[in-house]
Each structure stands twice: as structure tokens, then as C-alpha cells.
Amino acid sequence: MFKAIVMLNRREDLSREAFGRWWLDEHRPLVRQLPGLRRYVVNLVEEGPEEGGDGFAELWFESREAFDAAYATDAGKAVVADSMAHARSRLRYVVAEHE
């Protein structure tokens, strides 16, 4: 299983509350349209440093190839465009999960 974590920092003109509403109500439905997506979890920051991330998404795919293929589709391009329309920065991490 392949896992990526995406950290978004909201635009300065968006409150944390407005950013969270956008992510859950508008962005999450777009992400769920990604082909091959196995699981998607959104973690919104309620308390933390202002210079840190405002939200973290965890995405699981069967493989790196499936992840790359999903983001190469029109749905994937729409997800990235929507993210960047609401965030001042976006960082993506490929991670190995250990329990």
C-alpha cells in the first residue's frame, strides 16, 4: 500500500474555520473522485503554530503508480488546482506507515 500526506497552509485571507469548511464541504468530494483512491482522511489543525500547516490529508493508493496515474487525470488536476486556489502553500510527503 502506498501512502502520501499532503500539508496545506491556508491563504492569509481565510480563517481556519472557513478553510476547514472549504476542505470538508468542497475539496473532499473532489478528492474522493480520484481513481484508485483506497482511503482518505482529513486532519484539520485546531491549535498549533501559525507558521505550521492548517490541515493534513492522508491518501492511500494500491501503489505509487496508481497515485501518479490518479493525479495525471482530469480529476487529479482539478484536485491540485482547487488546493492551490485556497492554499498559500502545499507540501506532499510520501511516507512509510508503521504500527
Model-derived features: positions:
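Macromolecular interaction modules
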Residues: 1-99
